[in-house]
Amino acid sequence: MCYDEKAEKILPFLFFVVILHTIYLVGLRARFDVARKTTMSDSLSPIQQEKTTTNNPQPNMSYLFSSESVSEGHPDKVCDQISDALLDQFLAYDDKSRCAIESFCTTGQVVIMGEVTSKEYIDLQTITRRTINNIGYTKSEYQFDGNSCGILTAIHEQSGDINMGVDRSKKEGLTEEQRRQAEENQGAGDQGMMFGYASNETENYLPVSLDLSHLLVRTLADIRKEGNEMHYLRPDAKSQVTVEYNDEGEPVRIDTIVVSTQHDDFIKPGVPSISTQDEADRLMLSRIREDVINILIPRVKKQIHSEKVLALFNDDMKILVNPTGKFVIGGPHGDTGLTGRKIIVDTYGGKGAHGGGAFSGKDSSKVDRSAAYMTRYIAKNMVAAGVADEMLVQVAYAIGVAKPVSIYVNTYGRSHVSMKDSEIAAKVSELFDLRPKAIERVLKLRQPMYLETAAYGHMGRKNEIVKKTFSSLYHETKEVEVELFTWEKLDQVDRIREAFGI
């Protein structure tokens, strides 16, 4: 056979091999590209990932999101209220007081600890007992009540090292102008990062799941204090609301409501037709469930003015009431309480972010509190002005330094201005003075305004002016006009719109 004949027979085979090899190489290259993109994505910064997502939109999916709240009788909230009641008392008689007051409570016992620098002395025990009684712990059968609980105090003066770094205006040899400048540049009381968040899904710019959770337990407390219905209620309670969101991230319906409320042992075995404890417990649970559905939830709905939020209630939503079946033992007798353990309830219910610092018991020199309020003020006014539908603002401080070390903004891709988030952050820096002393001045944080914040959330509350009365064994009774929740005001909207050209 000649060479040409051999080649003629081999060529089709070689051509087939070349095609297979080419297919293999194309497949290998595709797998390599996928692996490389995955690796690059993992190494991208959050901002780069945001840009990648924006440039290559992926199909969204609906999801469920939950938030919880607790009542004023929850043991952790008892401690928050004690700490803030004491802080208010110090500020009422000395508005320059520096406080970091922690409280601890358990069966029949309260411990008050922390650091205070103030020229005034207050009666810690009287204020603590009054606060506990006002919450509703007034009966010995609760195993914790304001009249008989033991109270230990371990308050000492604030560290001189911290005070020296924070307040340089007290140094000797300063002129009046130097003293004024030093006071204006008061350093941050600690390092850390603080977050503020706002969303337009409710009228008060909170996540709807958290807003409804607060409303459930607050209304339950109102019913308990009125004493006309649900007479068996005790102070401790929790709620949780799960909301379904659609592909665009909009709330479409309530999926689940959970209510757990402490109650009297109001049905007991031994009465006619009830022979066992299990039967008594079953009847109690049935009664509480009926009352939650027929009394509590209708009262909650009457307080909602947004048709959009009312439309989330539906016939298919699940309502879980006291899922354990019985909740007689509760409050500090059931669980130990501690100041600062409900920071997600206090803020945004798991939306946005949290820097980890608690609020209650701290005066406004502590940026954990004051800067968290300021960033909420910024985020809420920015969303109300139309800059974005949703916004997270972060600031970070170094202890003893007045200006923040960083400012960060995230609009979650829901901005309405032709600016990057980093450019919006730069605008925030121009529009708002974020030094601690300036925050104190703008938000009027040297007022005795804090007890009202210690239950049912620090954010999304009503800004109003009230008169508060303070009395003490060591001072005459004092009436003070106080503006509450100043960080919820929408008084920067016009200024923001002008700055952003909206």
Which role does the model predict for each range below?
Residues 70, 74-79, 187-201, 328-352, ...:
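Conserved phosphate/anionic-ligand binding catalytic regions in large, soluble enzymes, centered on
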Residues 341-343, 348-392, 403-410:
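C-terminal catalytic subdomain
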Residues 4-14:
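Positively charged N-terminal leader segments that act as targeting/secretion signals
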Residues 66, 137, 145-329, 460, ...:
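Glycine-rich, mobile lid/loop segments that gate access to catalytic sites or pores
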Residues 388-390, 397-502:
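Internal helix-turn-beta structural module
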Residues 99-103, 108-169:
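Glycine-rich, N-terminal phosphate-binding loop and its surrounding beta-alpha-beta segment
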Residues 3, 19-23, 27, 31, ...:
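Short, positively charged and aromatic/hydrophobic N-terminal segments
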Residues 41-47, 51, 56-100:
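N-terminal, positively charged regions that mediate nucleic acid binding
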